[in-house]
From Swiss-Prot:
This is O-fucosyltransferase 38. It is found in: Membrane. GO terms for molecular function: glycosyltransferase activity. Belongs to the glycosyltransferase GT106 family. The gene is OFUT38.
Length: 522
C-alpha cells in the first residue's frame, strides 16, 4: 500500500515535470511562430502596397501621357464630371409622340420612270455641305422633269470653306448612281463625243415650279448639254407634284449616302458617345467667324473682334448686305445664340449639369474663353477631337466638308438636337430627324429668349425657377413634334414670300411622311 502510494506520487511528479517542460517549450515555439508570421505578413503586405502604389502611379502617368500626347488612342473621352444624376424630367430626352407617322418615299402608280435621253445636265453645287446636299437633290428632280442624263455634280471648292474634296470623297458615288437608276440616269462624266459641244449656261430661277422646267426643255432644240451654275433652292418648297417631292426625299435620304470612310467613322463616334454617356445632346453651335461676319452679330465681342468681322463682310463679294445694325439683328432673333446664352437656355429647359453635350461646329470664334460660360454650366462638352484620335481624323484635316459630314451624322443620331441658329445644317438635320420618326429637336425662340436675356442684364430676372418657367412655356411647341410645313408669312407677296416659307427639307411632312393608315415602307 505504501509502495503503491509512493509509486503514484513519483508518476505524478514525473508527469508534472514533463508538463512544465513541454509547456515552456510550447510557449517559446508559439512566440517564435507568431513573430515569424508577423514578419512574413508585414513583408508580403508591404510588397503588395508597393505594387498597388506603383500601379496607381503608372495609371496616373499613363493618363497624363494620353492628355499630353498628340494622338489619343480611340476612343478617348475626358473623365465625365458631375456623374451624380439629380432628378431630371425624362420628357427632356424622349421623342415627341409621332402618332404612328412613318417615312414614305415610294413613287405613286402615276410616276413616270426614267427613259433614255441624249440630253445632259452638268452642275456646279454651291455652298457648304448641306446647301450642296439639298441642291443636288433639287437638281436630280430637275433632271427627271427635263428628261436629262445627270453628270455627277461638281462640288464647291471656292467658297469660304476652301475644300478641295470631290463628289466621291464625300458621298458614296456608286450608291448614288444605283439608287436613282429608275429616276434619272447618272454618269460620272460626259461622253467624249459630247464633251466638246457648246453648252447652255443657265442660272435657273430659285424656287421654281415644274412648269418652269418644262418650259426650259426648249433649250434641247439648240443644245445637248445644259450647265447649271448653282444648285441650291432650284425648286419650290410647296405646290409641287407629290412624286417630285418624294423623289427629292429619295435622293436626300437614300441616294446621297456619305462615303464609306465618313459613314464608318461617324457611326463609330456615335457608338463611343452612347457607350460613354448613354445619351447626349448634339449642339450645333453656329458661333464661327463666317456666320458672325455674315449676320453682322457682334453682341458680347470686343471692338477689335467687331472690326475684324466688319472687314471680312466688306471683303466678301457675294455677301450683298454690308451695313448691319447688330443690336437690331439680335432683337429680331436673327443672331446665333452665344455660348453663354445657350448654357442659360439649356439649364432653363431643365437639363442637368451632368448632361453630355457634343459640339457640332467648326472653330468657335474666341476659342475656349468664349466657351467658358457654357462649360461652367455644362462641364461635359465633347468635340470631334476628343472622340477620335489624330490618326482617325488625318483624312479630315483641312476638309471642312468632311468634318461637317461627321457633325451631321452625330447630330442626326443624337437623343436631342439643338441648333443655336437656323442655317442650312440646322434645317437639314431637323428635316432628317422628322423623317426618321420625329426625334426630339429643340429650336430656340431666339427673339423671345433675347427679351429674357435683356431682363437678366438689367437685373430684373435671374437664373432659377422663374426663368425656367418662361423658357419652358416659350418652347413647349418647339420640340420637333409632328406638324405640317409652314407656308409664307401673311402679307408678303411676290417672290419674297418664298424666303419666309419653311423649307421643304426642314419639314418634308406631309409628302414624305405618312400616317399609320398607309402601308409602312421597309
Amino acid at each position: 500500500m505504501v509502495k503503491h502510494r509512493n509509486s503514484s506520487r513519483s508518476i505524478i511528479s514525473y508527469s508534472s515535470s514533463i508538463a512544465r517542460f513541454f509547456s515552456r517549450k510550447a510557449i517559446s515555439l508559439y512566440l517564435i511562430f507568431v513573430f515569424a508570421f508577423t514578419i512574413w505578413v508585414l513583408v508580403f503586405s508591404s510588397r503588395n502596397i508597393q505594387t498597388d502604389d506603383d500601379h496607381t502611379k503608372h495609371q496616373q502617368q499613363h493618363h497624363r501621357d494620353l492628355i499630353d500626347s498628340e494622338s489619343f488612342p480611340p476612343p478617348y473621352l475626358p473623365p465625365r464630371k458631375n456623374l451624380q444624376k439629380p432628378y431630371e424630367n425624362t420628357q427632356l430626352w424622349t421623342p415627341p409622340f409621332s402618332f404612328g407617322l412613318h417615312p414614305c418615299v415610294k413613287p405613286t402608280p402615276k410616276y413616270k420612270e426614267f427613259s433614255e435621253s441624249d440630253h445632259y445636265i452638268t452642275v456646279k453645287s454651291n455652298g457648304g455641305l448641306n446647301q450642296m446636299r439639298t441642291g443636288i437633290a433639287d437638281i436630280v428632280a430637275v433632271a427627271h422633269i427635263m428628261n436629262a442624263t445627270l453628270v455627277i455634280p461638281e462640288l464647291d471648292k471656292r467658297s469660304f470653306w476652301q475644300d478641295s474634296s470631290v463628289f466621291s470623297d464625300i458621298f458614296d458615288e456608286e450608291q448614288f448612281i444605283k439608287s436613282l437608276r429608275r429616276d434619272v440616269k447618272v454618269i460620272k462624266k460626259l461622253p467624249k463625243e459630247v464633251e466638246s459641244l457648246p453648252r447652255a449656261r443657265k442660272h435657273f430661277t430659285s424656287w421654281s415650279s415644274v412648269g418652269y422646267y418644262e418650259e426650259m426643255t426648249h433649250l434641247w432644240k439648240e443644245y445637248k448639254v445644259i450647265h447649271v451654275a448653282k444648285s441650291d433652292s432650284r425648286l419650290a418648297n410647296n405646290d409641287l407634284p407629290i412624286d417630285v417631292q418624294r423623289l427629292r426625299c429619295r435622293v436626300l435620304y437614300r441616294g446621297l449616302c456619305f462615303s464609306p470612310a465618313i459613314e464608318s467613322l461617324g457611326q463609330k463616334l456615335v457608338e463611343r458617345l452612347k457607350s460613354r454617356a448613354g445619351r447626349y445632346i448634339a449642339l450645333h453651335l453656329r458661333y464661327e467667324k463666317d456666320m458672325l461676319a455674315f449676320t453682322g452679330c457682334t453682341y458680347g465681342l470686343t471692338d477689335a473682334e467687331s472690326e475684324e468681322l466688319r472687314v471680312m463682310r466688306e471683303s466678301t463679294s457675294h455677301w450683298k448686305i454690308k451695313s448691319i445694325n447688330s443690336t437690331e439683328q439680335r432683337e429680331e432673333g436673327l443672331c446665333p445664340l452665344t455660348p453663354k446664352e445657350v448654357g442659360i437656355f439649356l439649364k432653363g429647359l431643365g437639363y442637368s449639369q451632368s448632361t453630355v453635350i457634343y459640339i457640332a461646329a467648326g472653330e468657335i470664334y474666341g476659342g475656349d474663353d468664349r466657351l467658358s460660360e457654357l462649360k461652367s454650366r455644362f462641364p461635359n462638352l465633347v468635340f470631334k477631337e476628343t472622340l477620335a484620335g489624330n490618326e482617325e481624323l488625318k483624312g479630315f484635316t483641312g476638309h471642312a466638308t468632311k468634318t461637317a459630314a461627321l457633325d451631321y451624322i452625330i447630330s442626326v443620331e443624337s437623343d436631342v438636337f439643338v441648333p443655336s441658329h437656323s442655317g442650312n445644317m440646322a434645317r437639314a438635320v431637323e428635316g432628317h430627324r422628322r423623317f426618321l420618326g420625329h426625334r426630339r429637336t429643340i429650336t430656340p425662340d431666339r427673339k423671345g429668349l433675347v427679351k429674357l436675356f435683356v431682363k437678366m442684364e438689367r437685373g430684373q430676372l435671374k437664373e432659377g425657377p422663374k426663368l425656367s418657367n418662361f423658357v419652358n412655356q416659350m418652347h413647349k411647341d418647339r420640340q420637333g413634334a409632328p406638324r405640317r410645313r409652314k407656308g409664307p408669312t401673311q402679307g408678303i407677296k411676290g417672290r419674297a414670300r418664298f424666303r419666309t416659307e419653311e423649307a421643304f427639307y426642314e419639314n418634308p411632312y406631309p409628302e414624305c411622311i405618312c400616317s399609320s393608315k398607309e402601308h409602312k415602307e421597309p
